[in-house]
């Protein structure tokens, strides 16, 4: 099976306090914290050189629908601009809530009400918009092998 969560626009629309907090945020994304986590350091460094960290807005606008979509996932390591005078305790470089907020946002994709679950069969075709969804491949096929072909369509990037 595969699951996709649609950009979590519904969460963004409903949670006014969260919406105000995350609107200006940017986040760091790294392949190292997922695929590279269990690799020897040499392979991890080579992977990171091939796929360097990137920084993106946490809330992006879909170029065709105008919908606000969240861009946080398992590759998101931290917010890069959460430290402000309003949310850092005096005299300490400690940001309360940043870790919990990131866990909350990434955890929303695991809620079944925000997902479409696709059961693959021979000849199945599924299409989703990577600019507004997150994909998860359930590990429900062993001892069989998972074989699929994936194609990407070049389009307008989300801004």
What are these regions (language model features)?
Residues 22, 66, 123:
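A residue-level signal for conserved active-site and pocket-lining positions in enzyme catalytic cores
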Residues 1-12:
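Single conserved hydrophobic/aromatic residue that forms the stacking wall/gate
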Residues 28-35, 114:
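Intrinsically disordered or highly flexible coil/loop and linker segments, enriched in small
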Residues 10-28:
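Compact, glycine/acidic-enriched structural inserts
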Residues 1, 62, 135:
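Histidine-centered active-site/metal-ligand motif
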Residues 95-106:
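Short, basic/aromatic beta-hairpin or loop at an interaction surface
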Residues 36-88:
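A mid-sequence, solvent-exposed acidic-amphipathic segment
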